[in-house]
C-alpha cells in the first residue's frame, strides 16, 4: 500500500523557495499530492466526493463543448464540399462584405474543402456564406444538445467512481 508520495523539486527552485514545499506536519502526511487520498494512520480513504467529481467532469464536458465549437467541419453546397467553422467564418467575412459592396475583384474564387479554387460570383459567395452559417448553426445545436444530455446523465450518477468513469463525447465514440 502506498501511504505517501513525495516529489523532489529541489533542482527547480532556489532552496526554501519551492512552491511545492509544505510544512512537515502530521496533517500534511495524511493526504497524497493529488488531494484525493487520505491516510489516517491505519487505512487509506478516498477523499473525492461525488460533488467534486461532478464538478471535474462538468469542466471536462465544457472543454469538450468548447473544442467541438472551435473545430472545423465540412458540408456540401452546390455539389461541392466546403469548410465551415469559426475560422472559416472569420475568413469569409471580409470577402462577403466586399461582395455585398460590389467590390469583389475580377475572377474571384473561393477554395473548397478539397483545395480546389472555385470561381464564384458575389451572389454565389454570399449564398455560400449563408449556407456555411446554417451548417454552423446546425452543428452548434447538435453540440449544445449533446453537452446538455451529458450533464443530465451526469446528475443521475451517485458515486465519484461512476462519475469519473463517464465518457465525455459523442454517444457513439
Where are these regions (language model features)?
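A preference for well-ordered globular domain cores
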Residues: 2-173
Amino acid at each position: 500500500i502506498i501511504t505517501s508520495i513525495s516529489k523532489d523539486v529541489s533542482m527547480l527552485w532556489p532552496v526554501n523557495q519551492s512552491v511545492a514545499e509544505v510544512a512537515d506536519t502530521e496533517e500534511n502526511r495524511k493526504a497524497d499530492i493529488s488531494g484525493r487520498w487520505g491516510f489516517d494512520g491505519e487505512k487509506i480513504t478516498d477523499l473525492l466526493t461525488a460533488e467534486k467529481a461532478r464538478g471535474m467532469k462538468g469542466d471536462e464536458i465544457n472543454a469538450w463543448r468548447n473544442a467541438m465549437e472551435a473545430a472545423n467541419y465540412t458540408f456540401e453546397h452546390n455539389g461541392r464540399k466546403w469548410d465551415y467553422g469559426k475560422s472559416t467564418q472569420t475568413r469569409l467575412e471580409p470577402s462577403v462584405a466586399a461582395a455585398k459592396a460590389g467590390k469583389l475583384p475580377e475572377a474571384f474564387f473561393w477554395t473548397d474543402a478539397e483545395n480546389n479554387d472555385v470561381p464564384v460570383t458575389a451572389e454565389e459567395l454570399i449564398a455560400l456564406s449563408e449556407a456555411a452559417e446554417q451548417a454552423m448553426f446546425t452543428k452548434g445545436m447538435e453540440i449544445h444538445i449533446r453537452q446538455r444530455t451529458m450533464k443530465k446523465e451526469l446528475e443521475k450518477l451517485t458515486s465519484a467512481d461512476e462519475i469519473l468513469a463517464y465518457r465525455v463525447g459523442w454517444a457513439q465514440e
